[in-house]
Every structure is written in structure tokens, then in C-alpha cells.
Amino acid sequence: MAKLTVKDVELKGKKVLVRVDFNVPVKDGVITNDNRITAALPTIKYILEQGGRAILFSHLGRVKEEADKEGKSLAPVAADLAAKLGQDVKFIPGVTRGAELEAAVNSLEDGQVLLVENTRFEDVDGKKESKNDPELGKYWASLGDGIFVNDAFGTAHRAHASNVGISANVEKAVAGFLLENEIAYIQEAVENPERPFVAILGGSKVSDKIGVIENLLEKADKVLIGGGMTYTFFKAQGIEIGNSLVEEDKLDVAKALLEKSNGKLILPVDSKEANAFADYTEVKYTEGEAVDPGFLGLDIGPKSIAKFDEALTGAKTVVWNGPMGVFENPDFQAGTIGVMDAIVKQPGVKSIIGGGDSAAAAINLGYADKFSWISTGGGASMELLEGKELPGLAALTEK
């Protein structure tokens, strides 16, 4: 990566501004999944060990009006982070700017941490965070000593005041360890993969993945398709899909992708289906691509798993984004499990999960430690897989 990293700058005695991704699920004031906090620890600890004073910024959820602030404070995160670091984390509830915040920042000593309140509290008055208000970026930058560390891959595809805005107003904007790893794994996999390189794309909508499919058809040796978007590809070929999910306005796109794929695009050959998405009374397996009338496909079948297993044999690089079925339901998780088994058994494979539902599937089904890398950013990893430049990354200082 041709950008400066946190190891390239002198941190001792400096007030270091750090954008982290602490956008974690919180229910009744309790964090239900702290993976993103854990992922940021190496960078935070490094800054503190080097004698820096860490000033952390993060958003939590969406905040559009005053009422949305309820339940969106980073207070539970501050407490969780303090426990993980084994030291106090300064935090002022509800405060994202002003004299009280400035006094707290200026009272920091070497090796101490302050977490600023949810950056999206600034969105209540004119979306200042989300629209990258220049005055806000300049103000937040003024709290530090000219060094900004971006370690929030999950928001790197957004141009916000707390990443791009601060970057524009500091002497050095550098990557943290998490951001560096994310870019190294995902970009390297797409731009310079060890071959054979197989991409697996699932999820419900073709529309979400058009750019990714187009880019990966150029870069990968094979692209396997599963999940709900399978049925848009099926219908584009005139195959009966029953009541399965379909994007009627994307049938031409699906057809065009199939035509230009030169056989690289591999689709399922059977389905596990039900007579309703949620309150179903009948589940059955259908041999062949067609789905029976009155039913909808909710997972790939055993022949598809075997076909994908064969396609993955010998793969040295695998990028997976999107489950094969409704994995949250035990009736429809066999496809996702089968594909994970097929990936992780390949000797010497570099296996990367592109965040989102795939990451949730690997974690919930006990496969997380079997993959080389699980991305912390769904949207950001999708844009990297699409070949796009990420604003948060572009704003960093060149080496």
C-alpha cells in the first residue's frame, strides 16, 4: 500500500486523532457483538505504547433528528473499550464539540484515551458529518497535533467529516493496522491473486452486485453465484422459478452477464425450497434448476454444493461475499455450510470473506477462525471488489 501507516509517524507526546469503526449492535444499552471494537485494539494500543494521546472518533447507527440520539450514544462502547484496554477512557456524553470537549482533550497525558461522542450527532443539524461539512472537519482536526489515523475500513467508502474532512486539515493522514490489513487482503486478492482465483457471490439482489460481478469476471478464473439472486439469472434464461425472489428490471443485465462470462459464471443446479419465506408449512428439495409453482428457492441443493466444491478444487485465492441461502434458518443453511467447507479444505488457500452477511454466517456457524481474513466492512469491501477507489483511502498521505 503506497500510503503512510501509523508506523511511519512519530507519536510520542502527540494528540493523535483516530477514526475507528465502533458501529456495533447495541440492545438496551448492551453491546451484542464487539468484534469491531476488538479489531481496532492493535492500532489504539500501538499509539498508547508509543506515548501518543488517542482521540477516537466513530459513528453509531443513523441519526437524522434529535429523537434518533436515544440509544445511539457511544457510552456503552467507552465502557467496553476501557475494560478491554484495562484503563480509563474519557468520554463526555452528548458532546461532539465545544469548550468541555476541548478541555478534556487538552488535559490528556501520554498514553491516555478519549472517545468523542457519536459523530453522527452532528447530522441532526444539516448532516454535517455525513455531508463532510468543511468547518466540522477543520474543527475536529484542530483538536489534534497534525496526525490523523484512519482505521475505519467500514466507512472508507464514505466521504465524511470524520475521515476525509479531518484528513484534509492535518499534516499527515495515515492508515491504521486494520485498514492496512483490509486493503492488503482484499485489494491484493483482486489485483494480484495467486491462481486459480475463485469468487463466490451470494445474497438476494443482482442489483447490489452488478459492478462486482463485472469486475470479477475480468479478474477471477471462476465466479460462482448463489443466494436469492440465482433466480434472476434463472428467469433470464427462461427457467421457471415459482415464487422465488426475482428482479424483473435486471433480467436483461443478468442475461448480458451470462453471455459475456465465457463460461466463468457458474450457477446452482438444484434448490431447497419452501411454500413461504417465513411461515412455511412445507419444505422440499427439487432436483434441477426449475422451482415448483407456489414455492420459492431458499437455499442451493446438494448437487449445487458438489458442483461448487468441484469448482473450488485447487483454488489458491477465494473471495466470498454473500450467503448461499437463508442461513439464519437451520432449514436453509446447508448450502452456506457446504460452500464454507469446500473453501476451507483447500490446501494453502488464501480465503477472504467480504464482510456483511457472509461474515455473520461464518461467525455464527463456527467457521470464523478457518478463514484467512474476514472483512469488517460490507459496503467498503464491495466497492473494493468492484474496483472502485475508496474516498477514505484516497485521502491518506502518500509514502
From Swiss-Prot:
GO terms for biological process: gluconeogenesis; glycolytic process. Its EC number is 2.7.2.3. The keyword Cytoplasm applies. Pathway: Carbohydrate degradation; glycolysis; pyruvate from D-glyceraldehyde 3-phosphate: step 2/5. It is an enzyme of class 2 (transferase). GO terms for cellular component: cytosol. It catalyses: (2R)-3-phosphoglycerate + ATP = (2R)-3-phospho-glyceroyl phosphate + ADP. ATP binds at K209, G297, E328, G355, G356, D357, S358. Belongs to the phosphoglycerate kinase family. This is Phosphoglycerate kinase. It comes from Streptococcus thermophilus (strain ATCC BAA-250 / LMG 18311). The lineage of its organism: Bacteria, Bacillati, Bacillota, Bacilli, Lactobacillales.
